[in-house]
């Protein structure tokens, strides 16, 4: 079976995107390339045993989707310890709720957000008591 091993975030304003994801999730952004500008997106420490993947950040090559337009991309979902706490961080950092928190019964809490660049991403809090 083939696995996802990398993701990319496109941004109109790269500094704003790095600040958003750094403030909300604590991610780090080492510069990988000068031209075209490309940053890594480190979602865990280098030797972490946590499951997950790292990605990249690049300049958006075309206009962002308009509000209300469907997403024409894969959506990455971030596992968190406390959904409500992360929601507050997202909103404080300039993100918006795209689909409010809902239960995946017996499994988790799930919801979707827009970052400062208009990208959709999910948030997932495991909870076997969710209903």
Label the model's feature ranges.
Residues 1, 8-52:
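Core segments of cupin and vicinal oxygen chelate
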Residues 1-19, 73-78, 125-131:
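N-terminal beta-strand motif that seeds the catalytic metal site of vicinal oxygen chelate
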Residues 2-3, 16-17, 21, 34, ...:
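A general marker of short, structured functional hotspots
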Residues 6, 54, 120:
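Short hydrophobic-acidic sequence motifs that mark active-site Asp/Glu residues
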Residues 9, 23, 30-32, 87-131:
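Vicinal oxygen chelate
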Residues 14, 25, 42-79, 84, ...:
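Conserved, structured core segments of small domains
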Residues 38-40, 77, 110-112:
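Conserved hydrophobic/aromatic beta-strand scaffold that supports enzyme active sites
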């Amino acid at each position: 079976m083939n696995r996802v091993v990398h993701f990319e975030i496109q941004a109109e304003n790269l500094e704003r995107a790095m600040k958003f994801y750094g403030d909300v999730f604590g991610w780090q952004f080492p510069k990988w390339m000068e031209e075209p500008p490309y940053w890594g997106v480190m979602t865990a420490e280098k030797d972490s045993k946590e499951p997950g993947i790292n990605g990249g950040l690049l300049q958006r090559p075309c206009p962002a989707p308009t509000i209300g337009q469907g997403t024409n991309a894969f959506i990455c979902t971030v596992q968190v310890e406390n959904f409500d706490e992360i929601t507050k961080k997202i909103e404080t950092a300039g993100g918006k709720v795209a689909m409010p928190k809902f239960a995946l019964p017996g499994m988790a809490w799930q919801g979707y957000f827009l970052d400062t660049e208009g990208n959709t991403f999910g948030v997932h809090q495991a909870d076997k008591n969710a209903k």
